[in-house]
Amino acid sequence: MSLTINSNIAATRASKYLASNHQNLQKSLDRLSSGRRITEPADDAGGLAVSMKLENEINQLEGAANNIANAISFLQVQDGILENISNIVMRLGELKSMSDDVLQDGSTIYDSEVADLSTQLDTYTTATNNTFNGVNLLDSTSNLTVTAGSQSITISRHDIATALTSGDNNSDDFTNLTLVGNITSADDVNEILEQVAELRATNGGEANQLQYAMADVSTQITNLTAAKGRIMDVDIAAESANLARQQILVQASAAMVAQANAANNVALTLLQ
């Protein structure tokens, strides 16, 4: 092998390996510091494309989960109102029973409370009096539709005014009572309670449907997140071993560059 000054092939090759090893070391540091296997498209273009699609699906499902959570809260508030209505109607029935006591000297002592309770019931029939984030809780004109992933779920906004009437042709209106005597019989109370109970049953069924939808969406989010992680996340143990290897290679190649440069000093010795 000839000895030259202008060309140092050994040093050139060692420098090339040093640059390559240093680049690999930098890549390993990037992966460990970010926790990602893919830090730029060149690492795995196909994997990056798949992970972006998965992330988009996850984001959409998380939005659906928020929609479902809000719908569940809506139903919980709605049921609270229906429960209050049930309690008021039961109290009216109690007042009716007490007014029928033959030992009572008249029923007028209950009239004031009956009128007050009836007025409270009447407030529930006005949709704008009962809202959740600006949305009417009780509105017979329309229902709501919640998008839960791939399915749509209907949320009922009940006709509470009709539920608070009983008797033939809905002649007994519990939102317009002024006297305990306006309550025809205990059967009227029972009829209205049954009607309100049906509304609460519908509310509960819709809430259960939303809970199942939430569980389904949560499962999808978990599975998609795991799939994305398998593509994007770095194996810390394996990458740590690779980092140690690259550090040794960088040190070794740097030492070889120095050795290759020193080898040409022999030519100077010959020229002396």
Give short role names for the model-derived ranges.
Residues 2-12, 19, 33, 37-41, ...:
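Amphipathic alpha-helical coiled-coil/heptad-repeat segments
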Residues 24-25:
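N-terminal glycine-rich anion-binding loops that anchor highly charged ligand groups
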Residues 235, 248, 252:
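Short alpha-helical H-box segment flanking the phosphoacceptor histidine in two-component systems
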Residues 240-244:
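A short, polar/charged loop-to-alpha-helix boundary motif
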